[in-house]
């Protein structure tokens, strides 16, 4: 039987030790556990391609920052210790609709987003309550506030 002191820590134990400024068995890994540790959807699509992962799809849960929802296969591949409890809308297809990232890669975005092409200036505009709220100009990678 293995000595419990030499068993690897669980993700929870590892993160708790790090927060308490104690030395864990390795550094905790976070990839998309919260918005500030997220990964841009275009980078995520390229990461999946580099790893040879063809299953699943790129889903953008934060349009402004273009953040991707990191799939379980990628989390597992990197031994990620921190996961998000709030990013996902779920797997149901009716919750997502197709779109293309600025580099042309197919993705899915939340179905409830009122996203319209800007016929005058090019790019895209996100509308809420009849007002243009965020805009992605041609050549840009992110949405910015449309109303200041």
Could you tell me what each predicted segment is?
Residues 1-148:
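Catalytic cores of TIM-barrel enzymes
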């Amino acid at each position: 039987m293995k000595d419990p002191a030499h068993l690897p820590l669980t993700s929870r134990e590892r993160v708790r030790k790090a927060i308490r400024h104690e030395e864990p068995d390795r550094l905790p890994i976070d990839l998309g556990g919260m918005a500030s540790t997220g990964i841009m959807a275009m980078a995520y699509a390229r990461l999946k391609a580099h790893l040879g992962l063809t299953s699943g799809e790129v889903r953008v849960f934060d349009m402004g920052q273009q953040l991707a929802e990191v799939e379980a296969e990628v989390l597992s591949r990197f031994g990620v210790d921190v996961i998000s409890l709030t990013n996902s809308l779920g797997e149901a297809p009716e919750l997502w609709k197709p779109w293309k990232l600025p580099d042309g890669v197919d993705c899915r975005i939340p179905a409830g987003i009122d996203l319209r092409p800007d016929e005058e200036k090019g790019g895209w505009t996100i509308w809420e309550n009849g007002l243009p709220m965020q805009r992605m100009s041609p050549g840009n990678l992110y949405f910015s506030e449309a109303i200041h």
